[in-house]
Amino acid sequence: MINHRICILGGTGFVGHHLVSRLAASGYPCRVLARRPERHRDLLLAPGTELRWSGGFETDVLKEQFRGCTAVVNLVGILNEGNGQTFQQVHVNLVEHILAAAQAVDVPRYLHMSALHAQATEGTSRYLRTKGMGEDLAHADTGMQVTSFRPSVIFGPGDGFFNRFATLLKITPVVFPLACPDARFAPVYVGDVVSAMVRALADPGCVGKRYDLCGPRIYSLKALVEYTADLIGRRRIVIGLPDVGARLQARIFQLLPGKPFTMDNYLSLQTDSICGHNNLAELGIQPQTMEALVPGYLR
């Protein structure tokens, strides 16, 4: 086993589960922070994995969690504000705490999960702007060896994209009204994303880089929803809403429990989630297609 313990924030989520498994398979012991570790004991099946309770993400708390680690991975992010969490707190303030804590206990390496087209000033939504602010903060800190990753929508077993649309399609009768149907995505496989992160850990040449990660093909949102409906055997007429309808849907849906669609989501969709240059190839990774993988887990 490699003598480098990796501390992971957000390790109990979709990408986190896949990353812990891949790191363990590559010989890296992991320390995963969780507010409710008893709910995530499955992570302990990965050899060398330690699951720690974390009562908060303040600098002093994180210093103790990071002690003895050689790298920190931050996968924490939210798509909507609520439950006392704001984009500023999660995407910006947390990064400040991580950097301060890591430097205080001499952790040299930091991997940061950002988002495709995250830009501090030019982002079309608060989500993208705060993601950009956090990313810029990390790269501006000369005391850390930083690599960030900017994926398009990520798919794979347990994802929140195809599985979510599958659930919505199952409960929607006949007609499925879709906001922003022409928004474009290049869905990237979670296995390719975590491969990029593991390779970056081992390669000093990745320090300081910001990697855009995309799948090999581009699709409209409408095409992805129709593909999902076909896979789960639901005949639905997917009707793209005009812009005024999309805005109205967002204003109504953001008032519902769970906020299935918000105005900030709408604004994020005004920027196509596609790569100008896909950096997976630079990392020696051949991106896998959704057609080869999604049918294996979506029901």
Predicted features and spans:
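SDR active-site strand-loop-helix element
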Residues: L9, L33, L75-V76, Y110-L116, ...
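Short-chain dehydrogenase/reductase
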Residues: Q88-V92, T124-E135, F155, D159, ...
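NAD(P)H-binding glycine-rich loop region in Rossmannoid oxidoreductase-like domains
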Residues: E38-D42, P47-H97, A101-A104, L116-G123
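Conserved loop-to-helix N-cap of the C-terminal "lid" that shapes the substrate pocket in Rossmann-like
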Residues: S148, G158, P181, A186-V194, ...
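Conserved beta-loop-beta element that borders a ligand/cofactor-binding pocket
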Residues: S114, D136-G160, A166-T167
